[in-house]
């Protein structure tokens, strides 16, 4: 009996310490107000209706996020269905509903809703009205400004209509004729962000191994008269980093109504990020109004590193040749399908490091927390647009390239972009990678091709 108690205590200590390490490795997001859970171990119950297959034809409860097949809805299909004569993929649709509160204190602010991943076509409806155009593509984050659709001080209803098979043939060819299980549903988190009318919408950062720093910030609203204050601190010990002229901040006054603001400077005594020593820093961006009040704060983790490619020679990281020893990885869990969590990402990244490997690719954009783990543990990453031997058409492909890069652009682990997975590239979308990765302009490759 005593041995059993001791064993249980040891397991409890292990998982407590493991979760603590995982939380430290994962980037925090205090700006998010979650409507779903954050992973397979943290879900919320929504109402759900499935059109066909198991448990169809009636309203039931479902946990979000999670692929609906793993909760007993619809039908399973494997991606090589087309190799069996007469077989068709399951194509059920699902309707999700969830009610949430909108306090009166949100008046005068912008409210945006974010979906981190829905398979495959998603129509978003707020209080009976569409939030925007149909989103297509199962591996990408998308969002809508829903300010004008909300009822302040009341319950509001979110409805999501999801089609497992896309109405776009190129998406089905790129994502759903592949050597993996074909799932449906809201499988990554859903959240709200409440923002001031004038705010920093998106930012792109560049930080080299000598401390040179650039930020390109997209503003929403007329920010003339505002200023942006940038500071950097060490993630490890919280110590403030100083600029080359001895200041703790870089202040950028916004003297025009332009949407893009460029900031540059240099930070001193930087310890570079590498695969052997993945040193991370926290960049804080503060937006101040003309009266000097901070109206918005955004933080993200960065690593100061320089990536260079030389023909017939190879990849250099911070001036030292990097011998890449890589592995492929899928985002998958036995309980959630494509729904995972930060602890699983941590475990996979740790196992890859223990195999003496230093690089990863994973067929499609992974969960963001896996990139966080690569940042924290020192794995370089090739971020890849989905497209298993077939490419997206130019219109939808352009949108999905933008969504992938805007989500992932500031991760130091990413050293390469890949336009398509194992042969699924569209050359018309090639220029967009440098357009959205506008500061670092990392190399983009075509898998299986002698390109770039």
Walk through the language-model features, giving the residues of each.
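Conserved, mostly hydrophobic/aromatic
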Residues: 128, 190, 281, 319, ...
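Substrate-binding/catalytic cleft of secreted carbohydrate-active enzymes
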Residues: 349-352, 359-452
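Short glycine/proline/serine/threonine-rich loop/turn segments at secondary-structure transition edges
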Residues: 106-109, 150-155, 266-280
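Accessory carbohydrate-binding/adhesion or oligomerization-edge regions at the termini
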Residues: 16, 24-80, 161-170, 237
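Bacterial Sec-dependent N-terminal signal peptides
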Residues: 1-28
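N-terminal carbohydrate-binding accessory modules
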Residues: 32-37, 203-204, 284-352
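Beta-strand-rich binding/interaction modules
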Residues: 126, 212-250
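Accessory beta-strand-rich segments of carbohydrate-active enzymes
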Residues: 27-32, 49, 67, 91-202, ...
């Amino acid at each position: 009996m005593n041995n059993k108690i001791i064993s249980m205590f040891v397991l409890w200590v292990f998982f407590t310490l493991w979760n603590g390490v995982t939380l430290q490795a994962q980037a925090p997001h205090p700006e998010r107000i979650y409507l779903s859970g954050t992973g397979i171990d943290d879900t919320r119950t929504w109402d759900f209706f499935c059109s066909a297959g198991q448990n169809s034809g009636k309203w039931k409860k479902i946990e979000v996020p999670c692929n609906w097949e793993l909760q007993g809805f619809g039908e399973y299909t494997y991606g090589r269905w087309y190799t069996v004569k007469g077989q068709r993929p399951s194509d059920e649709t699902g309707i999700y509903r969830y009610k949430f509160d909108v306090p009166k204190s949100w008046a005068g602010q912008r409210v945006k809703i974010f979906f981190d991943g829905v398979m495959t076509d998603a129509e978003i409806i707020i209080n009976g009205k569409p939030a925007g155009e149909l989103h297509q593509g199962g591996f990408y984050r998308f969002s809508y400004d829903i300010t004008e659709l909300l009822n302040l001080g009341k319950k509001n209803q979110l409805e999501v209509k999801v089609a497992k098979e896309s109405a776009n043939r190129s998406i089905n060819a790129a994502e759903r004729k592949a050597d993996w299980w074909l799932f449906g549903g809201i499988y990554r988190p859903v959240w709200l962000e409440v923002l001031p009318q004038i705010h920093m919408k998106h930012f792109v950062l560049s930080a080299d191994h000598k401390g040179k720093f650039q930020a390109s910030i997209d503003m929403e609203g007329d920010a003339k008269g505002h200023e942006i204050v940038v500071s950097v601190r060490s993630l490890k010990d919280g110590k403030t980093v100083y600029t080359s002229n001895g200041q703790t901040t870089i202040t950028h006054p916004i003297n025009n109504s332009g949407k893009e603001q460029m900031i540059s400077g240099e930070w001193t005594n930087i310890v570079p990020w590498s695969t052997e020593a993945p040193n991370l820093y926290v960049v804080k961006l503060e937006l101040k109004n003309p009266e000097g009040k901070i109206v918005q704060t955004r933080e993200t983790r960065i690593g100061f590193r320089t990536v260079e490619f030389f023909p017939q020679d190879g990849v250099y990281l911070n001036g030292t040749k990097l011998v890449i020893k890589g592995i492929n990885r899928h985002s998958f869990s036995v309980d959630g399908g494509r729904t995972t969590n930060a602890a699983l990402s941590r475990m996979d990244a740790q196992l890859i490091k223990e195999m003496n490997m230093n690089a990863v690719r994973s067929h499609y954009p992974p969960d963001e927390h896996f990139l966080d783990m690569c940042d924290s543990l020192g794995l370089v990453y090739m971020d890849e647009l989905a497209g298993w031997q077939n490419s997206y058409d130019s219109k939808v492909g352009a949108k999905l390239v933008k969504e992938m890069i805007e989500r992932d652009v500031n991760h130091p682990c990413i050293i390469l972009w890949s336009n398509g997975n194992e042969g699924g590239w569209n050359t018309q979308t090639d220029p967009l990678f440098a357009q959205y990765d506008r500061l670092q302009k990392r190399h983009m490759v075509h898998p299986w091709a002698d390109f770039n």
